[in-house]
Amino acid sequence: MRPNRYEDTGNTTGDVSSNTPSTSGRWDLRRLNPPNRLWGSNGVTFGPDGRLYVAQFLAGQISAVDTATGDVDVVVPLDGPVQAPDDLAFGADGSMYIADLTPGRVWRRSPEGAYSLVSDQVQVPNGITCVGDRLFVNEMKMNGRLLELFPDGGDPVVLTDGLALGNAMQLGPDGCLYYPHMIGNQVWRIPPDGGTPELFAEEVDDPVAVRFDRGGVLVVLSRGPAGIVTRIDLATGARSVVVSGVLGLDNAAFDAENRMFVSSFGSGGVTEMREDGRTREIVPRGLSGPFGVTVDLRGTVYAADHYRLASPGDSGEHDSSGVITHELQPFVHGITADDGLLHFASEYGDVRTYDPVHRTTRVRAQGLNEPTGIERSPDGALVVAESGAGRVVRIDGRIDGTDTVTVLAEGLRHPVDIAFDAEGRCYVSDDELGAVLRIDDGGTVTVADGLGAPQGLAVRGDELFTVDVEHRCLRAVSLTTGETRIDAENLAVGLPPGITRTEPALFAAGMPGTPHPFAGLAVAPDGSLLLSANGEGSVLRLSARAPL
């Protein structure tokens, strides 16, 4: 089995390609959850070789899973021409067709492994299916289109438009293409040669994928937290509904024995699901990032995991993935705990405050340019690294419940994370400048430079710690002398060693695209450090050896 950006032995983590464990002479390192072998699992289909092929949008690759053994092999690597695969289908000749969502491309991969571009005229391509030698794709956007594409040349033909976020579709036994409107809770159908689309089913829970089992029954997956699956008899319209508990279902495929295998955009992995909702794990689920990490005063660790708020390991009850999901929270990246509340920053522009007890969310700011790291200042304001604008901003709440946003510093290259020391001084990491800066009276002072690509930032006593993603290490900076040292090496952060790739865009035709990775860092009440090992999908706890 080829490794999938993870190393699956021991209590520490390391570079996948070198199999070198993380090392530190000052800290004991321990994973709070296992590495994610198959994160960002989206479109699934069985290939000519009998394996289940999985499009991994967040990972930027496609893997093949042996459903008998759980073995995973990378087939389309993340440094190839495909950037953000969200769905896939096989043609009659064994060619793989790939919906590359963020750049708006559809690819053909020949049985020999050669790539050719089928179309770049589809916006946010998602659901894709083959009908014999014919190829169809739809758009995951408002007023999206369903099109036929021609791999051997020819302009796309639009069958219909007006889709309210299309997604996984399939030809039914009646000869029509069935597809969901994710916004609107509907399933529609249309003949492959065109015509008037027909509304087939309404009030279907958050439909994200429509599939047909071997008996011709329509199976509709829900993208919600309960993992609802609805079965509909085409002839009678009779329905049955089961709750599987698989959060964030994305797609499904049936094998020759009519066993259903499902993927999860929320937590990855592959799960076999029976008709009554019972499940059997094939590839364990896990964290999709993680991005930012924080810990509250009770010691509960929270990870911002793009689609959800999660806790790893010893933070509470969890499944075999070692992770508990608290809430589906779309597009969370920066995170900080604050007296029973959690504050989120989304790279897509907003800052939110979440009350986990009452499960309420308050929007604090919108329209920011890629806000990433977030921290509460000593006086109660929220301070955010606005990475895309090169700024650090402050969000203050008013008595009337509104908020004001003011600029603390600007002209930075790419600020990523925020931290405060005991005296209330504010620090910011800049991974393009390779430095940590202190904000003084609207300007910045360099605290340490030559740090590679510092991202996650935290202050512990009189030392500042940052995750250097370029060199895959944890760096310590003395706030009294300015001296720096490396405290841990060979961390599984960022891309695997030797891999370079074009970073997909944050937005795609006005829709959320691919998030930018962010390796967060936090200090726990007991003085340990929590680190987002986003190269493998785990959270690390670093406990100081005595004496430090």
Task: Report the location of each language-model feature.
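Sequence/structural signature of beta-propeller modules
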Residues: M1-G25, R545-L548
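Beta-strand-rich domains and repeat architectures in extracellular enzymes and scaffolds
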Residues: L32-Q61, A533-S538
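Structural signal for beta-propeller blades
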Residues: G60-I62, G104-V106, N143-L146, N185-V187, ...
